[in-house]
């Protein structure tokens, strides 16, 4: 089993170009697995972790409802945003500047074969990261992602999750609002859940801007501990 993960920080990158790159890495891992089974080989499969920040974009999961996007094509254009229907789970979400997006492309057979556990560990990495800023992140029953103030009238989402998996290989991942412009969430019903607010790290801390590189380091630290892996 290969528990080494190749880290790549893609910086500010177009959503479609990043999606294509994810698909390329995802397919590479799948091809090795298929070839191993076909030829009774035991070649190691690679694992990747991509950090990226996207320009303004809305994405809709495969089971999502398009009516949760509250903008017409012209309005999208006026806001300088794009839209894609994609092959992850979940409904609609927003990505943009000031948001930390992580795409782990893992062969879970290197770790454990349990998608539910995988999602919970992604959430846990974010919850532990928030705790370092004295913010209490929690899960909300029946809803993926990381929330604040669950069980109160002020429940709000700070991190969205949506993944795809095939033959235990994962892609897509999480989006943590660090310094995101929350106004862009007004144009959707986030994750298809009505009446729930969104928030960001800088808003919760009452500061103009948080250090995103520092946040990424903390996420990675907790991710490697939870998955018992090494990042190169």
Curated annotation (Swiss-Prot):
Alphabetically sorted, this entry's keywords are: Acyltransferase, Cytoplasm, Transferase
* Enzyme Commission number(s) from the entry: 2.3.1.181
Instruction: Give the EC class as a word.
Output: transferase
GO function term, MF aspect, one: lipoyl(octanoyl) transferase activity
InterPro entries, A to Z: aa-tRNA-synth_II/BPL/LPL, BPL_LPL_catalytic, Octanoyltransferase, Octanoyltransferase_CS
In what residue span(s) does the BPL/LPL catalytic domain sit?
A: 43-231
UniProt site positions, description: Lowers pKa of active site Cys? 157
GO terms (BP aspect) = protein modification process
* A cellular component annotation (GO) from this entry: cytoplasm
Pfam families in the cross-refs: LplA-B_cat
Q: Which positions are catalytic residues? A: 191
Q: Which reaction does it catalyse?
A: octanoyl-[ACP] + L-lysyl-[protein] = N(6)-octanoyl-L-lysyl-[protein] + holo-[ACP] + H(+)
**For binding substrate, which residues are annotated in this chain's numbering?**
88-95, 160-162, 173-175
Q: Where in the cell is it found?
A: Cytoplasm
Q: Which PROSITE patterns match?
A: BPL_LPL_CATALYTIC (PS51733), LIPB (PS01313)
Q: What is its main location?
A: cytoplasm
Which pathway does it serve?
Answer: Protein modification; protein lipoylation via endogenous pathway; protein N(6)-(lipoyl)lysine from octanoyl-[acyl-carrier-protein]: step 1/2
Any other noteworthy remark? In the reaction, the free carboxyl group of octanoic acid is attached via an amide linkage to the epsilon-amino group of a specific lysine residue of lipoyl domains of lipoate-dependent enzymes.
Extract the PANTHER family matched here: OCTANOYLTRANSFERASE
The Swiss-Prot or TrEMBL record describes its family as follows: Belongs to the LipB family.
The role this protein plays is:
Catalyzes the transfer of endogenously produced octanoic acid from octanoyl-acyl-carrier-protein onto the lipoyl domains of lipoate-dependent enzymes. Lipoyl-ACP can also act as a substrate although octanoyl-ACP is likely to be the physiological substrate.
Write down what this protein is called.
Answer: Octanoyltransferase
**Organism of this sequence:** Flavobacterium psychrophilum (strain ATCC 49511 / DSM 21280 / CIP 103535 / JIP02/86)
């Amino acid at each position: 089993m290969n528990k080494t993960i190749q880290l790549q920080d893609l910086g500010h990158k177009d959503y479609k170009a990043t999606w294509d790159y994810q698909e390329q890495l995802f397919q590479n891992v799948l091809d090795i697995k298929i070839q191993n089974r076909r030829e009774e080989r035991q070649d190691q499969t690679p694992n990747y972790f991509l950090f990226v920040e996207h320009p303004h974009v809305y994405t809709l999961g495969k089971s999502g409802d398009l009516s949760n996007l509250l903008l017409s094509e012209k309005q999208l254009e006026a806001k300088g945003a794009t839209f894609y229907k994609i092959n992850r789970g979940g409904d609609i979400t927003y990505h943009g500047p000031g948001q930390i997006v992580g795409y782990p492309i893992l062969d879970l057979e290197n770790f454990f074969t349990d998608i539910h556990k995988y999602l919970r560990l992604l959430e846990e990495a974010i919850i532990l990261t928030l705790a370092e800023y004295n913010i209490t992140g929690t899960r909300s029953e029946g809803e993926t992602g990381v929330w604040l103030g669950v069980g109160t009238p002020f429940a709000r989402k700070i991190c969205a999750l949506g993944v795809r998996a095939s033959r235990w290989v994962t892609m897509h991942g999480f989006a943590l609002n660090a310094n995101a412009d929350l106004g862009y969430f007004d144009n959707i019903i986030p994750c298809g859940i009505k009446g729930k607010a969104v928030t960001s790290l800088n808003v919760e801390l009452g500061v103009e801007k948080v250090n995103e590189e520092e946040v990424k380091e903390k996420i990675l630290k907790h991710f490697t501990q939870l998955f018992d892996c090494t990042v190169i």
